[in-house]
Amino acid sequence: MDMFNKVTAFLQQALETREPSINLLESFVDHWKAITNYYIETTDESRAVKNTDIPWRLRQMLDILVYEEKQQGEEAGPCMEYLLQHKILETLCTLGKAQYPPGMSQQVMVFFSKVLSHIQKPVLHLINVYRPVQKLINLCGLPHSQTEKEESQFLFAVCTQVNKDPYVLNYILEIKNDSLKRSSSTSDEAAEKDCSGSSSPERASSPSSSSSACSLLSRSGAHPVSSPQEATGMIPVLLHLEKSEKRRVAHRSLESLLLLVSSTQEDTGHLLAERTPLCDLLAQRLTELYLLIPSTIDPADIHSFSVVQWRTRFTQDSTAESQSFPGSENVYRFFCFLDLCNELIKQAPKVLGVKMARALHSQWLKGVIQPHLLQMSEVGILVHTTLLSCSVRHIHSPALLEELVQFMLGSDTDSETRQHLHTHLLRYRLIEHCNHISDEISITTLRLFEELLQKPNRRILSNLVLRNLENRSYKLPGTGASDERLRVESDLLDESEELEEDPFFPDMYDDSGDSNHEPLLSLPNVRERLNPNLHTQVVDTVNSFLCLVPQEAKTSHLVQGAGYDTYVHDAHKVFKECTALVRDWKWPDSAKATVNNPSTDFYEGHFLHILFDRIARILEQPYELNLQVTSVLSRLAVFPHPNLHEYLLDPYISLSPGARSLFSTLVRVIGDLMQRIQNITNVTDRLVVIRRQLMGLDEESMVDHMTLLKGVIVLEEFCKELAAVAFVKLPTEEQ
């Protein structure tokens, strides 16, 4: 029993003599005093900060603040109050600016970053926090800085806090507005009062203001370093760090910029748009990168350049070998930054996004690209048209796309006239370049328009084509489809004796078993359904295009793999894309009544006029140029607008005097073709040889009439493509 009592007494004594809990405030103050005492006692000015205990003590102070916050809950703890009242952050900022001991600014930025990121309660709106943060921001981005990594981490922490609470941006940007007031969990007034006039034991024994820090520095012989940087502020610094050769630094700076602008509050957007140089600096940087692209670059390399995303620049293998060519690094950096601008504009509040897009329009598009597109040098036109085409491919933000359309096409909405084509100079020049004496410029500019037609902006198609077709003045009023079929057939018969012998190629319906014709020739089987008239019209339209090319000029059925089933598949895919593109554009389902205005001659517009002129010369033009012209026209034909469909795909419309349609233009080409091939012996065999060469089945060899024969093959393929487009535009339930 005595032994049991002794053990019990021992345990009781142990419980009563527990070690008392650590006083966090005392420990916090001790660490801070140890740091300040270093400046009083040290005599070695060359000793690096990493060889002192300052970094360790700063880490201990941070740990105490984090632990205290977890224990205190909503209320600010005594250590945080001490940090604020004694302006510790202000003092650290001054010590960091002096770079004493050497490397101190690095430690200060790390401490600031961790305070902002680890402390959960908002503190950035407090005067004794945001003022030193402002000063530390102005120490970032200095020339030849050795602290880029720490600067980027610090700015990322600041931007993260701004993203969480956009209101604090007013403090960070030093924008004074008496109407901007808010309550805080810690009293600013109490902190200011305590820092300005009160005296406490802690304050008396611990230097806490910037003046105290300067006093410490003067005792130790160190002096604050003046900043040689002209442009200060968070945004200029972030864009300065974007140029860093260190990938992580550049990446983090751009992520910070994205955090800064991606606010849902319009007030923040107004603030960044009107009170900061963000928009101008972005445009300047993009322009700078564009001008770094060498003028001797090969346009073919740019055309084949795939779309890049700005974050891929910071991956280990940022540029693929397939995209490596002389000047590729400059091209790559430019398009990465263009993608970043797209992302910033999309994420920003509307007012800021529009302002950024307009800055890019003014400085980059109009200030740099336009003069190059309007110059006389063919080499310059070719390079910059290709760069613009690739830029169109990269642009995906609605606001920037709107500015691009305004830049290229203008804002005219009235129907075009032949007398007023120069209302928008760049639009006129670009369309004229589609008919340039240089085939390369023509091909490149046609590619530019093809890229433009794939963008989700209704003004593009309206400006280029639809505004000239909306009144249907290309069509004689009061004419029926059946009468027009007879007229077109009569025109075909009169065109040539060959067409008279076989106007619609009845061999299409024979039992030869040609699999190439199966998909479209299955259509007559559905004429017995509930809507036979619709099917009859579609079948007639499809066969009208299929039968345009005379039999002796057809070769697709003679070479395996040249059928039009592929065209049907491709047309269906493109039609789905175009339908999705225009879903919200509220296009009419059917064409409206013809407006009869005999005093006004129909003009298809500058763009279609050039395209029709080009297709009329298909037998005389280079193969690559023909491919591009037909590609643009087939893209236009796919769009589900009733007027556009009627004008490009209906063979039976009764055209008004002087008007031409795509089908009537092709009929004239066929008439020219019939005359030309009469003088060529074994024309079908020659065409088969050329077709096999184009398909890569045979090696290339010189053949007489090469341009003409290639033109015939493109013509046949184009007619098959238009037939496929007409077929896939049938309602799904009717196919």
Curated annotation (Swiss-Prot):
One Pfam family matching this protein: RAI16-like
Region (Disordered): 183-229
Low complexity biased stretches: 196-221
Family: Belongs to the FHIP family.
Protein's recorded name: FHF complex subunit HOOK-interacting protein 2B
